[in-house]
């Protein structure tokens, strides 16, 4: 069973979280804490697999508690917060939390949210907290002479920090447009864009239907919309779709990758990073089969080795690299 510690100053919230966890036999609540200081003590006492962490609490907030826990007793932390403090939630992710999930109105009749909530906790429980990075020189064999017109990045659990690390050294004049599909909830996409903008030199915005992607610009798929593209005289225009979810996900990486394969073929560079599940595996294979280039994050640096693994097992990977080398390879390709 997955051992869960609930941290929230609201007794009502704690009770409802317990009820949601009780709908599955996969989870065991090993403790409840009502402020950040208590959460540190309970973490050391109960040794949970996952901590569900609120942000706004007395004594010590969830942000400071996350920093201390990740320093003293690293544990998978799922930030469970309201939209008005979502920006702080991404700071918590930067401090080491695995994922973020907005609090609903606690309507237990919403089975979809309950399933999403349980999926997030299960995904967090699989997180690799001590990731290894190799900062060595990029080998010549890892380079490619292909020229690309679009970079498409797909990720889920652990994605915000992975993308931040990937893009942090990209110059503002990076010569290729970048599209990102990050599994994200409604109400949090704009906060994600704002946070990512503060972490890199490139322009970052939510993708807009009909927009022409520009070099040095990052376009993020909005929550609950698939990001696709269609051919145009300029190369392509971005499209947002309400097509059904894939793997219960919208936006889905598979949808973006398959669209990129159709429009750009061999001119597409795809990157599949950390995340639970198989989303992106089929789409990555489509890009590879069309002549494009697919980079998959290796197991050693993935927070959750699921999506990247699916692509590798499908035979879609052109290169399998640790996170820090992916950024170096993309920059090397762009400079050529």
Regions found by a protein language model. Name each.
Residues 2-5, 11-22, 26, 37-45, ...:
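Conserved acid/base catalytic micro-environments in cytosolic active-site loops
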Residues 34:
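Glycine-rich phosphate/oxyanion-binding loops and their immediately adjacent helices
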């Amino acid at each position: 069973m997955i051992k869960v510690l609930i941290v929230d100053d609201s007794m009502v919230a704690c009770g409802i979280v317990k009820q949601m966890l009780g709908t599955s036999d996969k989870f065991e609540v090993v403790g409840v804490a009502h402020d950040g200081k208590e959460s540190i003590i309970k973490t050391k006492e109960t040794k949970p697999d996952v901590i569900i962490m609120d942000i706004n609490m007395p004594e010590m907030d969830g942000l400071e508690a996350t920093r201390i826990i990740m320093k003293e007793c690293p544990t998978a932390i799922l930030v469970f917060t309201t939209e008005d403090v979502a920006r702080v939630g991404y700071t918590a992710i930067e401090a080491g939390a695995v994922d973020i999930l907005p609090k609903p109105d606690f309507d237990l009749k919403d089975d979809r949210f309950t399933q999403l909530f349980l999926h997030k906790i299960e995904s967090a429980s699989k997180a690799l907290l001590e990731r290894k990075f190799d900062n060595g020189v990029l080998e010549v064999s890892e380079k490619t002479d292909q020229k690309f017109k679009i970079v498409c990045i797909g990720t889920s659990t652990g994605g915000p920090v992975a993308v931040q690390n990937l893009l942090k050294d990209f110059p503002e004049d990076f010569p290729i447009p970048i599209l990102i599909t990050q599994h994200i909830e409604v109400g949090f996409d704009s906060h994600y864009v704002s946070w990512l903008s503060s972490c890199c030199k490139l322009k970052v915005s939510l993708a807009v239907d009909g927009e022409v992607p520009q070099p040095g610009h990052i376009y993020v798929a909005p929550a609950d919309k698939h990001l696709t593209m269609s051919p145009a005289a300029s190369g392509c225009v971005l499209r947002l779709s309400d097509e059904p979810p894939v793997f219960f996900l919208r936006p889905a990486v598979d949808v973006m990758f398959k669209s990129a394969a159709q429009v750009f073929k061999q001119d597409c560079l795809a990157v599949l990073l950390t995340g639970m599940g198989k989303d992106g595996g089929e789409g990555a294979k489509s890009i590879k089969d069309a002549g494009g280039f697919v980079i998959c994050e290796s197991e050693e640096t993935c927070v959750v080795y699921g999506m990247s693994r699916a692509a590798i097992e499908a035979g879609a990977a052109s290169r399998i690299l640790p996170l820090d080398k992916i950024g170096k390879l993309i920059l090397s390709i762009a400079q050529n």
